[in-house]
């Protein structure tokens, strides 16, 4: 109709990562050149080629009520914490978050693989009745948007995009478009990923993970270096 696209700005952000569990901590780590990549002995014991990963140091019990946590895999839990930070950082109130014009576009590369394996093991080794109803919100591909929209009582547009390592970028881009096209006034966007051997083994089998720097894990993540030999798997969440 010839109308100019609306301007989009970032008013708040939240992050959980191997180098900090808050924006200020992450910024400090980046300035000081701190690496969150460490050796994982479990990978070595299991016979993986890659023995390094990045794991956030955070206690979910300090941040998430047990009744909410039972619906979440670790990725959704990271996302919940990051989104809470983004809400606080933006200065938005509960009424703003629950407004029909406030949306949510968050995703992950996949569901909670650890929850999938646990459910399968329970069904095979004990009984399907032991799996329980909480496995579904952990293992569906829209686990992040389902958990976040429910936990924060959101009523606007809400869905997940999953596109491998581009997931969060696509979610943020799509969230921006929703505002530009006047479909929403506010959108929370980003992504999260859990860290568990059940996911790591898949990329290790592909030969996609770094294995040359197992004894020097802090040097393993070097995406644009001529001596790179794969990516380093890690966990965390980021929401704007």
Q: What are the roles of these predicted feature ranges?
A:
Residues 42-92, 106, 141-155:
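A glycine- and small-residue-enriched flexible loop/hinge segment at structural boundaries
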Residues 4-5, 21, 35, 40, ...:
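Acyl-thioester C-C bond-transforming condensing/cleaving domain
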Residues 1-68, 90:
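ACP-dependent fatty acid/polyketide chain-elongation machinery
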Residues 103:
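Conserved catalytic-site loops of classical short-chain dehydrogenases/reductases
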């Amino acid at each position: 109709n010839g109308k100019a696209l609306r301007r989009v700005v970032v008013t708040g952000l939240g992050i959980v990562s191997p180098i900090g569990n808050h924006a200020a901590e992450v910024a400090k780590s980046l300035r000081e050149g701190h690496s969150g990549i460490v050796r994982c002995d479990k990978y070595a014991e299991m016979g993986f080629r890659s023995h390094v990963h990045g794991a956030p140091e955070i206690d979910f019990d300090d941040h998430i009520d047990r009744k909410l946590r039972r619906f979440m895999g670790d990725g959704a839990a990271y996302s919940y914490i990051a989104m809470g930070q983004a809400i606080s950082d933006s200065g938005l109130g509960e009424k703003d978050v629950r407004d029909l014009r406030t949306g949510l576009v968050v995703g992950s590369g996949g569901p909670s693989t650890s929850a999938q394996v646990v459910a399968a093991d329970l069904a095979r080794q004990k009984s399907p009745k032991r799996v329980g109803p909480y496995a579904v919100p952990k293992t569906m591909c829209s686990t992040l948007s389902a958990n976040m929209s429910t936990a924060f009582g959101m009523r606007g547009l809400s869905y997940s995009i999953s596109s491998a390592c581009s997931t969060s970028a696509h979610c943020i881009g799509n969230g921006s478009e929703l505002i530009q096209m006047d479909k929403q006034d506010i959108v929370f966007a980003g992504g999260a990923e859990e860290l568990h051997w059940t996911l790591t083994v898949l990329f290790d089998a592909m030969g996609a993970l770094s294995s040359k720097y197992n004894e020097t894990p802090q040097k393993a993540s070097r995406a644009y270096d001529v001596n790179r030999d794969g990516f380093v798997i890690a966990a965390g969440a980021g929401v704007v």
